[in-house]
Amino acid sequence: MEKEIVFVLLDEFADWEAAFLAPALCSGVMPGRPGSYAAKYMSPDGESVRSIGGLRATPDYDASTLPESCAGLILVGGMQWESAAARQIAPLAGEALKRGILVGAICNAVSFMAANGLLNGVRHTGNTVEMLKQWGGANYTGEALYEERQAVRDGNVVTANGTGYLEFTRECLLA
């Protein structure tokens, strides 16, 4: 069974935040060294979503279950991480963390992780610590583990701020 990296896309996703990682996983980063993964896409209901830039994506999966073949879950940032649709993703992110597979989050998806208490035991970054506290409320107790950097990797968890998409790609590839 081919290993898959599942990219979670919500309406108004930030298409550039996955633009470097997906091809590196699939095609590799060095000539003659092919990638080791298949990039798959998920939306909460399995229906097509549109990016901030107007790119329409048709997902492979809905959020009802995390595929057994999933070797990583990437939460792509965007404008809808506070929506009801986004709430369907929290159990999958928690399951991925329990399985010990890569969980990557960038931009507002990091704030979503804070809001669901998923960053409290790992070093992380985000758009700002103030934003993580605002979104997370009582669920976010990881302020002492926050680092003011473009991207942070702590074990199988990778986080990045909204301008750290290249660093996010690098840290996900190293995780």
Predicted feature descriptions by range:
Residues 52-60:
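Short gly/ser/thr-rich secondary-structure transition/capping motifs
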Residues 47-49:
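Mixed-charge, low-complexity segments
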Residues 2-14, 20, 27-45, 60-104, ...:
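Active-site-adjacent pocket-lining segments in enzyme domains
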